[in-house]
From Swiss-Prot:
<feature type="binding site">
    <location>
        <position position="176"/>
    </location>
    <ligand>
        <name>Ca(2+) 3</name>
    </ligand>
</feature>
<feature type="binding site">
    <location>
        <begin position="409"/>
        <end position="411"/>
    </location>
    <ligand>
        <name>substrate</name>
    </ligand>
</feature>
<feature type="binding site">
    <location>
        <position position="319"/>
    </location>
    <ligand>
        <name>substrate</name>
    </ligand>
</feature>
<dbReference type="Pfam" id="PF00128">
    <property type="entry name" value="Alpha-amylase"/>
</dbReference>
<dbReference type="GO" id="GO:0004556">
    <property type="term" value="F:alpha-amylase activity"/>
</dbReference>
<comment type="similarity">
    <text>Belongs to the glycosyl hydrolase 13 family.</text>
</comment>
<dbReference type="InterPro" id="IPR013780">
    <property type="entry name" value="Glyco_hydro_b"/>
</dbReference>
<protein>
    <recommendedName>
        <fullName>Alpha-amylase</fullName>
        <ecNumber>3.2.1.1</ecNumber>
    </recommendedName>
</protein>
<feature type="signal peptide">
    <location>
        <begin position="1"/>
        <end position="31"/>
    </location>
</feature>
<feature type="binding site">
    <location>
        <begin position="421"/>
        <end position="427"/>
    </location>
    <ligand>
        <name>substrate</name>
    </ligand>
</feature>
<feature type="binding site">
    <location>
        <position position="171"/>
    </location>
    <ligand>
        <name>Ca(2+) 1</name>
    </ligand>
</feature>
<feature type="binding site">
    <location>
        <position position="213"/>
    </location>
    <ligand>
        <name>Ca(2+) 1</name>
    </ligand>
</feature>
<dbReference type="GO" id="GO:0005983">
    <property type="term" value="P:starch catabolic process"/>
</dbReference>
<keyword id="KW-0326">Glycosidase</keyword>
<feature type="binding site">
    <location>
        <position position="431"/>
    </location>
    <ligand>
        <name>substrate</name>
    </ligand>
</feature>
<dbReference type="InterPro" id="IPR006046">
    <property type="entry name" value="Alpha_amylase"/>
</dbReference>
<dbReference type="InterPro" id="IPR006047">
    <property type="entry name" value="Glyco_hydro_13_cat_dom"/>
</dbReference>
Length: 434
């Protein structure tokens, strides 16, 4: 990411905020460190989540975070925001109102932190029934007709809403009507809404929810038109498992899907990345006595970071896999081993709110982020895997940092001269070159 270009594009920022951003440029050149600023239950917070998170801005910024990911901002049938209806209506969000959201974004900007909006545009819930009694009439949340759609904006092969639009370009979302992204009016009005979120509300970047629900070609249209400073797509597909229920050693097909998506959206010329679900799935199992999984057949990392690290956004858990949903949780007693991996390795690491604030891991995570920033580890850093056995994973990053994961202690003979331990915890240790 080029910080100066980002700041030029953000012409709505005040001069004082630009000065703060310039002061943090040394951190930003090391690459993004993302922070998911909510969980599945955040909407329940008394007084509103936006107001609550305002009290965490200083801690998040001080930790070296460059981007904070906020929940879907619009009116939604589902409290968490993932069943959106009136897209322009930010006052109906369970997280707070539009004014509170703008104040929160301004507070993050004042600390040099960019803000990612959770963009849910694969599907949408209707506001009214038509004359046949079918819910297929949508309201945009403005006095005019923007985003006021009918059944012709719904994919005709979708089971909801009796749609008459084009066929779906991606996977079906079972809980709500899938939007016809081939429709030019849909494209035009969604781009207008995204531009409004960026220019009027203050968002800098996008997280694309359920991005497998529409083609990468459609995602490219929205990203190219709105020019976010950063974008990350959720493309969560099933891994290939063996008879024991564990992931197969070879997950090339799984990570190829992620690489293909990024390539179609624009590749190296785009700010788009994808969540590295391949690394997530392998790491989940590897820390349970199978650390050999962390070296692929080619000697490189087995996830997306082994093929295209600059375009991989790594994570340990999120509001779906962890939190109260617990759909694919990381082993709870080994979470810091997961962070030791993603925060010292190539890729764009994302820290989960729960682990940082609720699990008592704040200081340990901060220490790892500090090492990453101090040593200039970036999304495309060079990774050399030194050992990968059942009880030991040892890797050198950029010739400056060595990461050890696993219970084995007798590793000093494997550490080159000129390195010293700078962080350690249950099942992990980090060395820096002196």
């Amino acid at each position: 990411m080029q910080v100066l270009n980002t700041m030029v594009n953000k012409h709505f920022l005040s001069l004082s905020v630009l000065i703060v951003l310039l002061g943090l440029s040394s951190n930003l050149t090391a690459g993004q460190v993302l922070f998911q600023g909510f969980n599945w239950e955040s909407w329940k917070e008394n007084g509103g989540w936006y107001n609550f998170l305002m009290g965490k801005v200083d801690d998040i910024a001080a930790a070296g975070i460059t981007h904070v990911w906020l929940p879907p901002p619009s009116h939604s049938v589902g409290e968490q925001g993932y069943m959106p209806g009136r897209l322009y209506d930010l006052d109906a969000s369970k997280y707070g109102n539009e004014a509170q959201l703008k104040s929160l974004i301004e507070a993050f900007h004042g600390k040099g932190v960019q803000v990612i909006a959770d963009i849910v545009i694969n599907h949408r819930t209707a506001e009214h029934k038509d004359g046949r009694g079918i819910y297929c009439l949508f309201e945009g949340g403005t006095p005019d007709s923007r985003l006021d759609w009918g059944p012709h904006m719904i994919c005709r092969d979708d089971p909801y809403g009796d749609g008459t639009g084009n066929p779906d370009t991606g996977a079906d979302f079972a809980a709500a009507p899938d939007i016809d992204h081939l429709n030019k009016r849909v494209q035009r009005e969604l781009i207008g809404w995204l531009d409004w979120l960026k220019m009027d509300i203050g968002f800098d970047a996008w997280r694309l929810d359920f991005a497998k629900g529409y083609s990468a070609d459609m995602a490219k249209i929205y990203i190219d038109a709105t020019e976010p400073s950063f974008a990350v797509a959720e493309i969560w597909t099933s891994m290939a498992n063996g008879g024991d229920g564990k992931p197969n050693y070879d997950q090339n097909a799984h990570r190829q899907e992620l690489v293909n998506w990024v390539d179609r959206v624009g590749g190296a010329n785009s700010n788009a990345t994808a969540f590295d679900f391949t690394t997530k799935g392998i790491l989940n199992v590897a820390v349970e006595g199978e650390l050999w999984r962390l070296r692929g057949e080619d000697g490189k990392a087995p996830g997306m970071i082994g093929w295209w690290p600059a375009k991989a956004t790594t994570f340990v858990d999120n509001h779906d896999t962890g939190s109260t949903q617990h759909l694919w949780p990381f082993p709870s007693d080994k979470v810091m081993q997961g962070y030791a991996y993603i925060l010292t390795h190539p890729g764009n690491p994302c820290i989960f709110y729960d682990h940082f604030f609720d699990w008592g891991l704040k200081e340990e995570i901060e220490r790892l982020v500090s090492i990453r920033n101090r040593q200039g580890i970036h999304p495309a850093s060079e990774l050399r895997i030194m050992e990968a056995d059942s009880d030991l994973y040892l890797a050198e990053i950029d010739g400056k940092v060595i990461t050890k994961i696993g219970p084995r202690y007798d590793v000093e003979h494997l550490i080159p001269e000129g390195f010293q331990v700078v962080a350690h915890g249950d099942g992990y240790a980090i060395w820096e070159k002196i």
